[in-house]
């Protein structure tokens, strides 16, 4: 399929070059296939602003949550393919690196203030660059914690989190709110548990081995799956929604938190703009799960939001796309809109972020807490791997038996080895 796409795009480029005289005055155009649904409204606004300022046409299409790879595959097969897309991890580099322009020495690469989030292919080509720095964990409404007769000081480890969450759930009818918002397992939400929460298994394996991963390991030990179970069980069994109803989705966890129906919301810093208006003192705590010494745990910090430019776009479209990227990170008005939604952007002329959750991440680090790196970015054959985990978790939510949890562990640990072999065999 990808060879066919590459051939089609090459033929389109040859045709464009042959007709170059007809397009001598072409300013080029931009087609941004956006990865983040929460950014869509702002992205559409920015596209309109840029077109009005420059005359360059900018099209923004936002993939539905959990469908980016399918959407990218479909869109790349079209004559008017995206000129700006996302390659967010090493699996993406393997799959889409050949479609990415080498950004080394470009104007957008020169705007970076760090190369920590850059992704390179095996030939050393800079195929994608990070456009925001994020963190994730458990978002908390301190007012509801206090209303339930508890204190944020109790939330320093799994034992404290469990005590508070179970106490709130037991009194949910009386209090008028529950502990956790819904933990839906449909495509719009399951990534919070199969991509993010599962990261605790990977990071604690790294810490046990004494080094962070620099490449995808062939196998996992599974030594921390009981800790993953601790936190997952706490989320689904002390919630507004019965675990048996999570598979089909349809619950709005963000709205549940914003409207004061739940004290805890498993998510990340990208939610700050959405929830802070309703819960201005919302804060974020780590994935406490019962690991020894977790009182010194911090938040999960990193990114999988990395821009790539289509190698097979016309020269005019490539130039227009890079110019648009530079404008997003350097124009004061445009950048302010981006930072409001995304938080920290790693560029020289980007404004400072006021994102409270990123401030929480910094505070944990300054207090000497260890950071959870985004080891989850190494998930092999990510879509297939996560699909297997979703299937097992759905069976477990329907019937929380030991046998069904064993299937979850198989999907997470044996499934990793299976997908690694498929990706590297």
Question: What are the functions of these language-model segments?
Answer:
Residues 62-71, 158-160, 244-259:
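Short helix-initiation/N-cap motifs at beta->coil->alpha
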Residues 127-131, 136, 162-217, 262:
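Extracytoplasmic/periplasmic solute-binding protein
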Residues 146, 170, 367-425:
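Conserved C-terminal helix/tail region of periplasmic/extracytoplasmic solute-binding proteins
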Residues 165-166, 211-247:
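Glycine-centered hinge/linker elements that transmit conformational signals in sensory
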Residues 102-115, 180, 184-187, 202-228, ...:
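Short, solvent-exposed loop/beta-turn-alpha elements that line the ligand-binding surface or hinge
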Residues 53, 146-148, 277-341:
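Extracytoplasmic/periplasmic substrate-recognition and gating elements
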Residues 88-139, 143-146, 283-286:
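Hinge/lid segment of periplasmic solute-binding proteins
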Residues 6-7, 20-92, 108-109, 293-294, ...:
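Conserved N-terminal structural module of periplasmic/extracytoplasmic solute-binding proteins
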